[in-house]
A protein has these predicted regions:
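Charge-dense, helix-prone N-terminal extensions
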Residues: 1-109
C-alpha cells in the first residue's frame, strides 16, 4: 500500500481502515500495474488513463469507478450516490466478486 495513503487513513476508525484495505486488495487482485496515490487528498488507483477512487467516511466508503453504473441492477442492496459512486457501509458485506469485475472492467477499458 502507498505510504501516503497509509498516512491519510490514520485519521479514520479501525473498522473503516479494515474495510478500506479489503476493498483496496480487490483493486490489486485485477493484476494490472496499479499506480496508487492521493489525488486531491483522495486515495486513487490508476492504470493508464483509468482511475478508481476509494473515499473513506466515518461509517462507509464511497467507491468511484466508471463501470459501477453498468452493474447497478446487481447492486440494489447498496446505495449509489447521484454521482454514481457505490457506498459500502460497515454493516454490509463487500460484494467481492462483483467488485472484482467492476474494477477490472474500469481499469482495462
Amino acid at each position: 500500500m502507498n505510504q501516503e495513503i497509509n498516512e491519510y487513513l490514520k485519521n479514520y476508525p479501525l473498522e473503516i481502515i479494515t474495510l478500506f484495505k479489503e476493498i483496496e486488495s480487490l483493486i490489486y487482485q485485477t493484476n494490472v500495474s496499479i499506480d496508487a496515490k492521493l489525488w486531491a487528498k483522495l486515495p486513487s488507483y490508476y492504470y493508464n488513463d483509468q482511475v478508481i477512487r476509494l473515499i473513506p467516511f466515518k461509517d462507509h466508503i464511497n467507491i468511484e469507478a466508471s463501470s459501477i453504473i453498468n452493474y447497478k441492477d446487481l447492486l440494489t442492496d447498496y446505495k449509489l450516490t447521484p454521482k454514481g459512486m457505490l457506498q459500502i457501509f460497515l454493516d454490509k458485506n463487500i460484494p467481492s466478486e462483483l467488485l472484482n469485475t467492476i474494477f477490472l472492467e474500469t481499469l482495462t477499458k
